Amino acid sequence: MAPEEKLPCELIEEILSRVPPESLVRFRTVSKKWNALFDDKMFINNHKMTFRFILATESKFYSVSMTPKIEVRELSLDIPGLELKPKILIDCNGFLLCGMEKEGIVVWNPWLRQAKWIKPKVNQPSLCFNGIGYEYDNMKLESSGYKTLVSYPNELDPTRSVWKIHDFASNSWKYTNLVMSCSSGVTLFGASVSLNGILYWVASHLKNNSLFVLVYYNFSNEKVYKFSDLPCGENHHHDVLVLRIFREDRLSLLKQCHLTKKIEIWVTKNKIRNCSSGDVDSAEWMNFMEVSTLNLPVLVHPSYFIDDKKLVVCSCDQTGQAWIYVVGDNKLISKIQIDSVVGPWPLHCSFFPSLVSIPRSQTKKAALQV
């Protein structure tokens, strides 16, 4: 019998690049090579998966992409209970999180048309879903299942928070004491980002709110640690500070001075690697970009991503109208008003589509097209 001929790798990639993303998930178990291929950036780009912004208004969701022109598409979403505008919209580990306060949160992968409700066991009007991460399995750098961190005000002392962890696999909740291993108390500032199962925040010192640091939360031992001082030095509490993931394995920080409107982008110099315990190595920062032209906008709760050497920002003007700004070479390259987005002051976040499937427990399909 003649030996079985194998298809060239290039031909396999070409064939798989034509398969709908929702069908690719089933092929992850074919081989380790195929599984790694679906996470390969070049393969993802062949599926036209690029950074975009997701916007949510009172009754609609939109995807805003650059190909290279601005393309706005309304998302047709059929998830019961998500008819109203969410209170929180963040991207985390390739998923989108829509926080509905006391109703819970919807975790979805719009690219794969998958969605899942996480319902809280506590009836609190101001639940805060802080992000999704995972523990590390003993001495192996492997995840042991997704978890989400939630907080809400303590009934006896509203100035303090109660913290709980939801486990995706068991659909169970447990209380956790958020132990601060930092040398002094801090207040978390803005939304978290998730990298390698670890949640990161900008935080301000309780005793001096002009001093900011980066902290991270380790799901393995349920503690908060200081990651580094902010690379941009001392800050005013009116300055814009936004943390993001950079090139999938590093962090980036956007700062806009509230007085001069100058924008700085800082990135970690090297890849951020987790230790076997799930802890994180210290980082060195470098200045990636500075823009100080006179026609810069005042950024209001911006979301952003870095496209090669350009900064792409979504922000609202004084009337609540959404705009996309492209910045590079120390100048404002372009600004585009998103006219087709219905409703002022939309929530928005940057999002990079992924082929990571939502954990199977109680997964629901949603008729959503990106």
UniProtKB/Swiss-Prot annotation:
InterPro entries, alphabetized: F-box-assoc_dom_typ1, F-box-assoc_interact_dom, F-box-like_dom_sf, F-box_dom, Gal_Oxase/kelch_b-propeller, SCF_F-box_component
All residue ranges annotated as the F-box domain in the record: 1-47
Xref: SUPFAM superfamilies: F-box domain, Galactose oxidase, central domain
Top-level lineage group: Eukaryota
Signal peptide: none
Pfam families to which the protein is assigned, alphabetical: F-box, FBA_1
Protein name according to UniProt: Putative F-box protein At1g47390
UniProt organism field: Arabidopsis thaliana
